[in-house]
């Protein structure tokens, strides 16, 4: 078609060209393009659920011998990865999550994340940008988690509903959700910049092949009101 008048570039030429690309600038431009594309897809203006998650990149290695960790923001409504940040250490995921949130337009959306994101600076960033959050609570916030466990038995849930049973991955699972006003459960409420809702999830699982039953109890903290639509 006359596009490559001097022939196909050699492998070495292509490698030199790729090595000359500023990967940070390229990632920034890609994020800008995806933000515009997301606006085009979301013409209805519906609330999006954005998941922040970190994954180790297998099959590649840094100079320190570790697999790099990539923290990404995924849009549940459009199916797009909105932005990514690479971390040299697992512990840097907290900082990377805050950087991601600073780059994204999340006003009116809901941010979901694992327990590592239950940090004051991340919560403040989400509230500051006009979004809500649902974040899992584990022992990394020990006083908060154990305080809720101590008090929750004396509180009545404002909402309670059950999903299942469902068969998945060889297990039959039934989940019960209990929604509480965090006012009575959280001691250091001022630290988190506003009202919080606590969600208790009780998963009862039966292994289909062995019949073994197990129960798991998890907690989530949210800025959404207790009566928010499911």
Regions found by a protein language model. Name each.
Residues 4-63:
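Active-site- or DNA-interface-adjacent structural scaffold in DNA-acting proteins
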Residues 61-64, 121-125, 145-149:
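Short acidic, glycine/serine/threonine-rich loops at helix termini
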